[in-house]
C-alpha cells in the first residue's frame, strides 16, 4: 500500500498530490509536464517534497513534519526507467545479479528462476545489452528491479521508447507481475492503451493536481473531467465475469452490469473476472431494437448527455445499467446528422449496437489445467 500526500514547488508548477494505491497496478495518467514523473521521483527519494508524507507498507519514507527522509537505497523501491539503463559491460545474468545482491539474502522474496521464467529471458542470460532488442532490454530491466525484492515497483513510461511491436511484446509480461509477485506497481504513462491494458487504479494528474483517482472503471465513467474528455474515444471499460460458453457457435458469454455479452472463445474458467473495452466508434445507436441484424450484442441504454459537435461528430454518454441498478457507462461516437435524424436528447431510451469489443488483461489469469 502506498499512501502519499505531498507538496512541491517545481519551477512554475505547484505540485499538490494526494492519493492511495493498493494492490495491483496504479497508473498515473496525464499530459506531458503534468507532474507524473515527479511523483514517482519523490517516492523513490530522487527528489524531495517541500512537505507532506510518503508511506509504503506502513514504512515511512518521508515525513516533512518529523524530519524523516530516507535515502533512496534504504527505501526498497524498484525503478524501471524509459530506457533500460543496463550496465553495458555486464551480461544479462550479471545485470540481474546486481539487483539481487543489493538485498540481504534473508530479505529476498523474489527468486531469480521465477523472474527469468516469467519474463521469458532464459535464452538471453549470457548476452550483453548491445545484443538485445529494445523490448528485451526492458524485460531485463524489469527483472533487475524485481530481484531487488522491492516493496513497490515504480515504472516511468517504460514502453515510451519502443515501437508498437515491441510494446506488444513487453505488455503481457508487465501485466502478469502483480499477481505473480504481489508487488504493487506505480505506472506512469500518457498512453491510454497501456493504461487500459494494465491499470487496476487510475490517478489522473492535471497541472500538478490529482483531478480524479479510484478504480479504473469508475474514473473512466466520470463525465466531469474536462482534461480526460478527449480520451474517451479510447473506449469504456466494463467489468465482467466468464458466465458460460456457446460451443456450437464458438462464443463465450460474459456477465456484465448491462447484461450478457457474447465474445470470442476464451479459455478461462467460469467465474473468472475480466474486463471488456468497448470503443466509442464501435457503438451504433437505434431507437428500436433491430430484429434482423448481424450484430450480436445489443444493450438497452439511456442517454445521459450529448457532447458538442467536433468535425461533424459528437460523443453520446450512455448508461446501459438496469433501471435502479448500478450504472454501466458507455460512450458512442456518432455523426451530427445521426443525432438530428434520430432526435436524440438526454433521457431518451435507445439501443446500443456493439459492433466490436476487446478483452483486456485476460493474460493476467493463471490458467488452471483443463
Curated annotation (Swiss-Prot):
Domain (ABC transporter): give its ranges. Answer: 1-232
Localization per record: Cell inner membrane
EC number(s) per entry: 7.3.2.5
Q: Does the keyword RNA-binding apply?
A: no
Query: What are the binding positions for ATP in this chain?
Result: 30-37
Database matches in Pfam families: ABC_tran, TOBE
Q: Among the entry's GO cellular component annotations, what is one? A: plasma membrane
Q: Which domain of life is it from?
A: Bacteria
Q: How does it assemble?
A: The complex is composed of two ATP-binding proteins (ModC), two transmembrane proteins (ModB) and a solute-binding protein (ModA).
Q: What is this protein called?
A: Molybdenum import ATP-binding protein ModC
Amino acid at each position: 500500500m502506498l499512501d502519499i500526500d505531498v507538496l512541491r514547488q517545481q519551477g512554475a508548477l505547484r505540485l499538490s498530490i494526494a492519493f492511495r494505491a493498493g494492490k495491483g497496478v496504479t497508473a498515473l495518467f496525464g499530459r506531458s509536464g503534468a507532474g507524473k514523473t515527479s511523483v514517482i521521483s519523490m517516492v523513490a527519494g530522487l527528489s524531495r517534497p517541500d512537505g507532506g508524507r510518503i508511506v509504503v507498507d506502513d514504512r515511512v519514507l518521508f515525513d516533512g513534519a518529523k524530519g524523516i527522509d530516507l535515502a533512496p537505497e534504504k527505501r526498497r523501491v524498484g525503478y524501471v526507467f524509459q530506457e533500460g539503463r543496463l550496465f553495458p559491460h555486464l551480461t544479462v545474468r550479471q545485470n540481474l545479479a546486481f539487483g539481487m545482491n543489493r538485498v540481504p539474502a534473508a530479505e529476498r522474496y523474489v527468486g531469480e528462476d521465477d523472474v527469468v521464467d516469467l519474463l521469458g529471458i532464459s535464452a538471453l542470460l549470457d548476452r550483453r545489452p548491445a545484443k538485445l532488442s529494445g523490448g528485451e532490454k526492458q524485460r531485463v530491466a524489469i527483472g533487475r528491479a524485481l530481484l531487488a525484492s522491492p516493496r513497490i515497483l515504480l515504472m516511468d513510461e517504460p514502453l515510451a521508447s519502443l515501437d508498437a511491436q515491441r510494446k506488444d511484446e513487453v505488455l503481457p509480461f508487465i501485466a502478469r507481475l502483480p499477481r505473480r509477485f504481489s508487488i504493487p506497481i506505480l505506472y506512469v504513462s500518457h498512453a491510454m492503451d497501456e493504461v487500459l491494458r494494465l491499470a487496476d487504479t487510475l490517478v489522473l494528474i492535471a497541472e500538478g493536481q490529482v483531478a480524479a483517482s479510484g478504480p479504473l472503471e469508475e474514473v473512466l465513467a466520470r463525465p466531469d473531467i474536462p482534461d480526460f474528455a478527449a480520451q474517451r474515444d479510447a473506449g469504456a471499460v466494463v467489468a465482467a465475469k466468464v458466465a458460460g460458453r456457446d460451443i456450437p457457435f464458438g462464443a463465450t458469454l460474459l456477465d456484465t452490469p448491462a447484461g450478457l455479452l457474447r465474445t470470442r472463445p476464451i479459455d478461462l474458467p467460469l467465474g473468472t473476472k475480466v474486463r471488456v473495452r468497448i470503443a466509442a466508434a464501435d457503438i451504433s445507436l437505434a431507437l428500436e431494437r433491430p430484429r434482423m441484424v448481424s450484430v450480436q450484442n445489443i444493450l438497452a441504454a439511456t442517454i445521459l448527455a450529448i457532447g458538442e459537435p467536433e468535425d461533424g461528430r459528437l460523443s453520446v454518454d450512455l448508461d446501459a445499467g438496469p433501471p435502479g441498478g448500478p450504472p454501466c457507462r458507455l460512450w458512442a461516437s456518432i455523426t451530427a446528422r445521426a443525432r438530428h435524424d434520430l432526435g436524440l436528447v438526454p433521457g431518451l431510451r435507445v439501443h446500443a449496437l456493439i459492433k466490436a469489443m476487446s478483452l483486456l488483461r485476460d493474460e493476467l489469469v493463471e490458467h488452471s489445467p483443463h
